[in-house]
From Swiss-Prot:
Name this protein carries in UniProt: Elongation factor Ts, mitochondrial
HAMAP family reported in the protein's UniProt record: EF_Ts (MF_00050)
Pfam family of the protein (one): EF_TS
Transit peptide feature, positions: 1-16
Gene responsible for this protein: TSF1
High-level lineage: Eukaryota, Fungi, Dikarya, Basidiomycota, Agaricomycotina
Predominant subcellular localization, coarse grouping: mitochondrion
Single annotated GO MF: translation elongation factor activity
Signal sequence, start to end: none
Disulfide bonds: none
UniProt organism field: Laccaria bicolor (strain S238N-H82 / ATCC MYA-4686)
UniProt keywords, alphabetically: Elongation factor, Mitochondrion, Protein biosynthesis, Transit peptide
A cellular component annotation (GO) from this entry: mitochondrion
Amino acid sequence: MYRNCRKAFTFSLRHYSTAPTEKPSLKLVAELRKRTEVSITKAREALSASNNDVSAALEWLQKDLITSGAKKAAKLGGRPTPEGLISVSVLSRGGESHVAGVRAAMIELNCETDFVGRNELFGRLAADIAHTAAYISDRTGSATAFNRAFPLDVLKDAPLLSQLNPTAPPTGTVGSSIRDMISKVGENVSLRRALAVVENSPSPNGDIALRIGSYVHDYKIGSLALLALKSRGISSSLNSDAFRERLEFLERALARQILGFETTSVNSSEDQTSLYNQPFMMFSREMDSPLVGEVLRNWSEKEGLLKENSDGGVAVLDFAKWKVGETFDE
């Protein structure tokens, strides 16, 4: 009786068995990884589930990323994120008649470890978020103030725009892209803060131009500085490539100065940490450098922006400096 049952069971297995799915080739795995940067295991799983069809495997990976990303985000959401990086995007430095004023943004994207913080995918996401923030921002507030309180919920709901390929159609929102990153790196990832500087360009025929200076060091600290140039015919000066080159050097030096010193304000006679009261070492690189305020006045005179007893020239209106993980006022 037992022998007959075993024969029947064996026959049944043979009758209903099917050929195993063909093992994904190394070529297909490599192609899928190149297009998606997933792990070898995940690429094989996607191809096996899609009958070795690359297009179907891409769709499978996208669905899997959404599902696994949401699960991991929920699981890792409470873990601290002390590491990360600062990213700056400047879409328009301003001061030229063919661009629409100043448009820039700075963001802080956090993760759990420095290893992930230096990951190329993580850095690319941060750059894209900063680019998106600069692109979608509207001007609010006074002409001399940064838009410091950029609403993170608005930014997370916005389509993520590529910094490297701005014309590429978005494949998801900022929020969904952060969840995807959590799934890829296996760590909690959080967007901590963002600011945008958006200032309309004054009249091309006027005597005032706005500019933005920026600097990021080691992706851990970054700064933005809003400048005003006041002089008759400033638009003509800005049309000169040589003048713009010298101006950009000054702007970069100011942004570096703000990072390199304990800068708490722009210009205050009672505050020794104010920018204008500091030796401008990032410009001349000498220990006995003249003060920032003096350098700006001398530079303006040399460039013909400042006449005697004139209130023109170049001036710093506002600035922001960030460091990864620092405490800040909400």
